[in-house]
């Protein structure tokens, strides 16, 4: 069987529709979302409600705490274990979410062709200790494409990218793009007309504020430092600036909406890279028809 990945831009309406389908076909949901993976970050990541999660079992939501390290490689390891467990139990695994790097980790895997060089890794690590930021500068120089994908604080992946470059003379970003897409997966992208999608984004942000996003951020800052990677994401970074009196709440809300719209555009651009993906525009068909088409896509052999 082929495994189904259902994706689409934020606020397109994936959760609502997939929940209904999953309950009809004995499916569980494996979240493909790099923010919903965090515990305590509920409102700002638009997690499914307790009621929604009670209807269908979800995995990789509330998986780690905000100060724990996690990346696409770890996601792949966890997701494949869960996938195989569900298949053995006769349950359909549905991968649902819009984090591009996580989707890539499933359909393309990771380049692992260069053996580890512990001596080189130690030397690079020492360089970073003596001159913080030097590895980032080197990566931007030798492999700018990889630098765009790797977070500045992700020293492990930075060292790996530099290790590959120094051992082979080739950029890890080029070697990764040469890998073929797995035939084990099929991708379905849900979309909407832009004006409708952006209106849904705006309404969802307003809903987050009403549900207590500001208090959620305050509570998080009582437990964790503000500079965690998890807090440098849309919805959290803007509210943190508001709490620091950098700007007022109206400005923070405006920026969350604006930044979310920009993020949705980037997601759409990323998803267009998957030439084999099927697209369904939810603005053009009824909910009933959409559910029929999605269910048919999932169950196709």
Swiss-Prot record:
Gene3D superfamilies named in the record: 1.10.20.140, P-loop containing nucleotide triphosphate hydrolases
Residues that bind substrate: 10-15
Region feature Interaction with substrate tRNA, mapped onto this chain: 33-36
Alphabetized NCBIfam families for the sequence: miaA
Enzymatic reactions: adenosine(37) in tRNA + dimethylallyl diphosphate = N(6)-dimethylallyladenosine(37) in tRNA + diphosphate
Residue sites binding ATP per the record: 8-15
Family note: Belongs to the IPP transferase family.
Protein's UniProt name: tRNA dimethylallyltransferase
Quaternary structure note: Monomer.
SS bond partners: none
Family annotation (SUPFAM superfamilies): P-loop containing nucleoside triphosphate hydrolases
